[in-house]
Structures are given as structure tokens and as C-alpha cells.
């Protein structure tokens, strides 16, 4: 075999080796990036109040339909209204409602806010069923902290908005999210 032919073969082998090495390194880097992007968000420290608004923590039982306990990465804060204009449909009554249906329905959210208190139902880093999008990989249920605002007639709606804004600001800061991460049910 001639010297030139051996050089060409060695160059081809070297090129193949470099190409395979680059592919392996790229795969490792992508796997590391995917791991850090997809691993669940670490849960923040619990609070008993947000800006002087009491926060009552009353988690739904883990392993129920409403709280399967699946951890995820937080990407959004999703703001809703309860749609319940019934008398006494305040945060405490919505908390009772969630506990009553927890075993039987895929319906849940993380917080209920009214004009004087906030109920905390599911840890922020677990999925809940509030956005109507199932478990869509980019959807609010899988990626969003759900906040429901009470709209009952005896509720001071303006104060509820302020309370929800304070809670949202606290969550944005706690999870290092920007304002673009705030969504509504319809987004």
C-alpha cells in the first residue's frame, strides 16, 4: 500500500473519530441541559402571610385525583377567577369544596384568594388541574401555579385583585420568573 493511500485512510479514520467524539460530547451536553431544564422546581419555604394577608396552608391529600403528587418545573403563574358568584363563595368555602371533591375529580389549583385571606391547597412544584389543558407539555396545568380569585358579591373584588397581585409578586420572586410568566386561564 502506498504512503499516500495510508495517509488518506488515516485522515478518514481521524475525521470519523473526531465526528464520533463531537457527537458523543454534544449528546452529553444536551442530556445535562435537558436534566436541568426538566427537573422539578425546588419548593420555596412556606409562608404564613404575604404582605400582611394571612396564608392558610391546607393541602389536599396526596395521591388523590385532584393531587397526584407529581412534581414539575414551574414556568408560569396562571391567574383565574373562580366564576362562583354565590353568597359566601370565599376562599375558605373553595378550600372546603376542593377537599370534598379531591378523591373524585381532576379539578384543583394551588391558591384561592379573596379580600382578606389566601388558602394554599397544593405545593407549588406539583401539578394541579386548573387550566383546562390536560397535561399538555407546554400547558398551565403541567407548568403553572394556579391562583383562583374569588368573585362572590360580598367580597371586595378590588382588594382581592391587590391580594392576588401580592401573591403573584411573591411567587415570581421566589421562582425567579419574569412578568411574561404571568398568564391567564385563556392564554
Task: Specify the residue positions occupied by each region the protein language model found.
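Active-site-adjacent loop/helix surface patches within enzyme catalytic domains
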Residues: 46-176
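Basic/polar, cationic surfaces and motifs that engage anionic cell-wall
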Residues: 2, 7-8, 13-16, 23, ...
